[in-house]
From Swiss-Prot:
Optimum pH is 7.5. Acetyl-CoA binds at A382, R399. This is Bifunctional protein GlmU. It comes from Methanocaldococcus jannaschii (strain ATCC 43067 / DSM 2661 / JAL-1 / JCM 10045 / NBRC 100440) (Methanococcus jannaschii). Residues 203-222 are annotated as: Linker. Its EC number is 2.7.7.23, 2.3.1.157. The gene is glmU.
Length: 408
């Protein structure tokens, strides 16, 4: 038994976070999405084939020493069907296929009982997904792609069990106008010829497609951690709840950490810093004097040195915040924060701060309005109020007129 994990997509709805990394490499609860998936499947299979393309070197470099993992590069044709077809000459007769951008709780042993199976999940908004219709024996009888009037509340959850017949059906599938070959089109042919079991997922499941999905999945996974403190803790530090502090991390004097939270190797907190629940500080980050971070993911090598507030935000790698940088995360009317996703204004959640790419620098007293996205490699000058998205490689600054008058 082998597994194929689909990791080739660009993750455009998650930009700017995916400008410098593939979506499966976005860290949630201290490790990439892809690592969470691999940990669910690695004991069940002999080989794990990662189908890579976009920013493939990030995936290869991170997982190159895993004994079961092999890398296959998807060709010019895009789409999930083409991604699966990439492994045609490598996998065993039976194999699992898993989307590389989902966080899920259920174990996968149930899938091994069937020749063909698709994971399904009951949701409140099936019209936003691919809908699955089952018969009385839980066999799939119909697939609908984002229908206006869904026939079911069950959706395709992105986990499959196939044999090599699926390759034959994928090859018969027409390439779409977008130049893609889709796996679901092949499954529509499969259900006409074979019984395909719909396996209902009962536990947590998250299709990580939007920035707030990352923060939601982060909360779910952090709720499962247990305290493990190996780093250096200075005097008068207060630690509450479940907190992981890795070896090589330092929490300086008079800081407060409220779990669940993870502080990775090389991170420095304090003195007098406040880390609130559902925060992850990745490797070599710095949250300094009188800075507060709440329910946020701070990626590697980012510095928030002093008198700053970051809430409900995702901050990329190698960012540096000037003194008194503030992220707002709540509207006055308490309605969901609106975010631009692929040129559309979308309602997110009640609290959402800033979504920031890599290598961003802010001057002193910079403020961000809720839901703002900042692209990679930006500079933001002192005293700016950022109330709209900033494209990558942009320098934003303001000019206030200074008036000089002679005193008598």
């Amino acid at each position: 038994m082998d597994a194929i994990i689909l990791c080739a997509g660009k993750g455009e709805r998650l930009r700017p976070l995916t400008e410098n990394r593939p979506k499966p490499m976005i860290p949630i609860a201290g490790k990439p999405i892809l690592q969470h998936i691999i940990e669910k499947v690695e004991d069940l299979v002999d080989n794990i084939y990662l189908i890579v393309k976009y920013k493939k070197e990030k995936i290869v470099d991170y997982f190159k020493n895993h004994p079961k993992i092999k890398f296959l590069e998807q060709g010019e044709i895009d789409g999930t069907g083409q991604a699966v077809l990439t492994a045609k000459d490598y996998v065993d007769d039976e194999f699992l296929v898993i989307n590389g951008d989902i966080i899920f709780e259920d174990d996968l042993e149930e899938f091994l009982k069937y020749k063909y199976a698709v994971a399904v999940k009951e949701v409140k908004n099936p019209e936003n997904f691919g809908v699955v219709v089952l018969d009385d024996e839980n066999n799939i009888i119909e697939l609908q792609e984002k229908p206006e009037n869904p026939k079911s509340n069950l959706i395709n959850a992105g986990i499959y069990k196939f044999d090599k017949k699926i390759f034959e059906l994928i090859e018969k599938t027409k390439i779409s106008e977008r130049g893609e070959r889709e796996l679901t089109d092949a499954i529509k042919h499969l259900i006409k010829e074979e019984k395909v079991k719909g396996i209902k997922l009962n536990g947590y499941w998250n299709d990580v497609g939007r920035p707030w999905d990352i923060l939601e999945a982060n909360k779910y996974l952090l709720d499962k951690i247990n305290t493990d403190i190996k780093g250096k803790i200075e005097e008068n530090v207060v630690i509450k709840g479940e907190v992981i502090i890795e070896e090589g991390a330092i929490v300086k004097a008079n800081s407060v950490i409220e779990g669940p939270a993870i502080i990775k190797k090389g991170a420095v907190v304090g003195p007098l810093a406040y880390i609130r629940p559902y925060t992850v500080l990745m490797e070599n980050t710095f949250v300094g004097n009188s800075s507060e971070v709440k329910a946020s993911i701070i990626m590697k090598n980012t510095k928030i040195p002093h008198l700053s507030y970051v809430g409900d935000s995702i901050i990329g790698e190698n960012c540096n915040f000037g003194c008194n940088t503030i992220t707002a995360n709540l509207r006055f009317d308490d309605k969901p924060v609106k975010v631009n996703i692929k040129s559309k204004r979308v309602e997110s959640v009640r609290k959402l701060g800033v979504i920031m790419g890599d290598n961003v620098k802010t001057g002193i007293q910079v403020s961000f309005m809720p839901g703002v996205k900042v692209g990679s490699n930006c500079w933001i000058g002192a005293s700016c109020l950022i109330d709209r998205d900033i494209e990558s490689n942009t320098f934003v600054y303001k000019r206030d007129e200074l008036i000089f008058r002679k005193l008598k």
